[in-house]
């Protein structure tokens, strides 16, 4: 059996107004690949966090709006998403060390600011790799479970 592979590329201005367009595209890509509703929602949150981080941090020192590149690679059993910018970089390991673990009994008013987006991305995606310089590139992979609907309307996952 021949393996199926598709590749989709987007370039958008690093502006918050484009986050919804990226989420909509992601929904279409994941739906077309047969992903479950839960996998689609998890990926939308993770990608929104990564794009929002790029919008807020990558080009803050530059008065011009930069560009964010988004790539979707659809494989037989997974979807790889790569989000990159050419803006300011950050030290991923240092930022990661300052987040979590969060205690379920911890008062939300006292949670540390920053880094929560990275925590969400790593929690919701199956594989996450961050490359820096030039800019920041976040590569995320979601292994997809297929979903079917039975005659009675019940959704079931298939392998």
Curated annotation (Swiss-Prot):
The keyword Kinase applies. It is an enzyme of class 2 (transferase). Its EC number is 2.7.11.1. Keywords: ATP-binding, Kinase, Nucleotide-binding, Serine/threonine-protein kinase, Transferase. One of its GO terms (molecular function) is protein serine/threonine kinase activity. It holds the Pfam family HATPase_c_2. It catalyses: L-seryl-[protein] + ATP = O-phospho-L-seryl-[protein] + ADP + H(+); L-threonyl-[protein] + ATP = O-phospho-L-threonyl-[protein] + ADP + H(+). InterPro entries: Anti-sigma-factor_SerPK, HATPase_C_sf, RsbW. NCBIfam families: PRK04069.1, rsbW_low_gc. Negative regulator of sigma-B activity. Phosphorylates and inactivates its specific antagonist protein, RsbV. Upon phosphorylation of RsbV, RsbW is released and binds to sigma-B, thereby blocking its ability to form an RNA polymerase holoenzyme (E-sigma-B). Belongs to the anti-sigma-factor family. This is Serine-protein kinase RsbW. The lineage of its organism: Bacteria, Bacillati, Bacillota, Bacilli, Bacillales. The gene is rsbW.
């Amino acid at each position: 059996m021949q393996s199926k592979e598709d590749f989709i590329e987007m370039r958008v201005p690093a502006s918050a107004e484009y986050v919804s367009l990226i989420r909509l595209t992601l929904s279409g890509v994941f739906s077309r690949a047969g992903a479950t509703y839960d996998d689609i929602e998890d990926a939308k949150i993770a990608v929104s966090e990564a794009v929002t981080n790029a919008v807020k941090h990558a080009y803050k020192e530059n008065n011009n709006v930069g560009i964010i590149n988004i790539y979707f690679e659809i494989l037989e059993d997974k979807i790889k998403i790569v989000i990159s910018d050419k803006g300011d970089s950050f030290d991923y390991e240092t930022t990661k060390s300052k987040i979590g673990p969060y205690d379920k009994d911890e008062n939300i008013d006292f949670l540390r600011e920053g880094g929560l987006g990275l925590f969400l991305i790593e929690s919701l995606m199956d594989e996450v790799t961050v490359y820096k310089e030039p800019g920041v590139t976040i590569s995320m992979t979601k292994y997809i479970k297929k979903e079917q609907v039975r005659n009675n309307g019940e959704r079931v996952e298939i392998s």
